[in-house]
């Protein structure tokens, strides 16, 4: 679920859920995302905020973060997925820090303002959060190649977060300038 498209697709497909009522029987149902497009929590906003659709029998609108695993449900019309993810997970989830918290760093004109120094792109906290989007190198394909110039540590230092379009892709994005680059070669240096 690390790719935006796979998270978005999770909202577009019908999900099969089961209710286990006893050891010998269970009931199942098919569910789709239950809320209308007038809600702030749409497939698009939830996916961008890091969530995929993960319903259960008791929580038909349950979502989970692809990175920290936080599960949220019972969405109301005015619930903002970015604000809620950042508020609940800013101390534990790299995606909440770098992507969802970014909205607090922009003023009405779209200019960046950093009232909190820890939110500066050059801060160690932000660099660590960006590195966390590469999932400790488990997802970033170039960390498995010794001496690769575009290792996850250098990518995070350069301001990139991992934003694969499909599983295994090496697309990384600078969220401050919206520059996405992929196809990293061994000799590339993101710095």
Regions found by a protein language model. Give the residues of each.
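Intrinsically disordered, low-complexity linker/tail regions enriched in polar/charged residues
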Residues: 1-191
């Amino acid at each position: 679920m690390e790719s935006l498209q796979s998270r978005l697709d999770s909202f577009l497909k019908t999900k099969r859920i089961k209710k286990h009522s006893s050891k010998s029987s269970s009931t199942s149902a098919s569910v789709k995302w239950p809320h209308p497009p007038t809600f702030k929590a749409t497939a698009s906003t939830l996916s961008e905020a890091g969530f995929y659709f993960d319903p259960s029998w008791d929580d038909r609108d349950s979502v989970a973060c692809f990175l920290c695993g936080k599960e949220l449900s019972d969405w109301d019309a005015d619930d903002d997925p970015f604000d809620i993810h950042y508020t609940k997970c800013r101390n534990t989830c790299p995606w909440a820090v770098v992507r969802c918290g970014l909205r607090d760093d922009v003023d009405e004109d779209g200019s960046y303002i950093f009232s909190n120094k820890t939110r500066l792109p050059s801060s160690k906290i932000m660099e660590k959060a960006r590195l966390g989007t590469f999932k400790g190198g488990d997802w970033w394909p170039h960390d498995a190649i010794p001496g690769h110039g575009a290792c996850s540590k250098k990518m995070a230092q350069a301001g990139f977060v991992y934003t694969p379009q499909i599983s295994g892709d090496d697309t990384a994005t600078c969220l401050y300038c919206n520059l996405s680059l992929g196809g990293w070669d061994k000799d590339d240096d993101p710095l």
